[in-house]
């Protein structure tokens, strides 16, 4: 059965209204979520650990006898690392090394300059003392979230890293714990949701207060970060993730499809768009999507995301493809084209950009 993904032609008379609708990802204000988060934050500030124990039992169905059990001991991280499949462990180690090397280039340096009158001006770069890392643990496990947040913090010189991760039913990914061990996280707590954000922002008898909270999460986590901002630093209010793949006739349609899937499986609200140079390319990508979807473990989530926010857009030239991509301003942009280098400088609005036929995120990922 064909996936009901939108198909647009950038030269069709009805393209503009359809494209505008595709880009309208405004999330309506949910008063019930806002109030629920306020209540959770207030409870954690008022009660501390008892609130965390109660909320963990309520939302993660995990009953603990005491607050000390909220912390996952380092021995558990080490054993998780040792129990990993050899291939996965090597992949995490490789990713860690590359992430660390990349972010070394981003380190800021302090500087001073002396004016003609002897006055000295300068900038003193100082790392934060303690940072809280939120790692999603609901619909999927993301060891990459640990590495991509913890390692840059270490490179920057952050003294202490506190990680929180929800553990529904008491279950937690060994890959996530192994990544915490690999990235030299200091402490890990099995807490999730708005209550975890509140604990990091204000501290409890067991969870230390941090200077800044980073990492992605669901609507409750995002709302909590928004509400505690000002009392603690945050990275951003992250929305649903997105990818745009620009592909020409030489792109492997199955690789394009898998990269669309890799983004769509994050969340039903994730957006995956392929911009195809020509009707033939678009048809081949569409056929690959229909053919491969049945074998995907997270098929239901992928299908909902593609049907709701996904699209295949036909263009007649690379100039038009880049123009459309710049209007979307995606978080991730792939140039699956024969000669990406000349077009890279024309990309004005994108987060991470991946160039070439071999650089698909499903096989390579920005984390590696």
What are these regions (language model features)?
Residues 113-178:
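Conserved small-residue-rich beta-alpha loop and adjacent elements
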Residues 3-11, 187-192, 312-317:
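Short acidic-hydrophobic, aromatic-tinged amphipathic segments that line or gate anion-handling sites
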Residues 362-368:
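Conserved small/polar residues in nucleotide/adenosyl-binding loops
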Residues 184-271:
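Conserved NAD(P)+-binding/catalytic subdomain of aldehyde/semialdehyde dehydrogenases
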Residues 236-308, 312:
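A conserved active-site cap/scaffold subdomain adjacent to cofactor or substrate pockets
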Residues 346-351:
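Small-residue-rich helix-loop
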Residues 1-129:
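N-terminal Rossmann-like NAD(P)+-binding subdomain of aldehyde/semialdehyde dehydrogenases
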